[in-house]
């Protein structure tokens, strides 16, 4: 999927404007999704400031909103063309680290309920 996104993005913004971003720290729900199925969390420009900060702002609406939507729509077309051949190939080659059942078992094993009784100090 990353190669498909790269090809699509380069077609939209040009080779000279495309660049790979190295792995970034942080956590997203896409990390969870990627444990059970092929996934992609692409970034496109148009924003300034740290993510989730009060100073984060979209400064280029074309690059921040329109081009990402076009890229994703173009990828959907490519993935579903020819009877979804592209999507089927990605799924066939995918080797997710967990099954759905394994993921749910893991998540349920991590769940717990804690009650803090501030009145008792403990």
Predicted regions located by residue number:
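Metal-dependent peptidase/peptidase-like ectodomains
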Residues: 1-15
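Zn-dependent metallopeptidase/amidohydrolase metal-coordination segment
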Residues: 18-75, 79-118
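Preference for extracellular/luminal or secreted protein segments
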Residues: 121-122
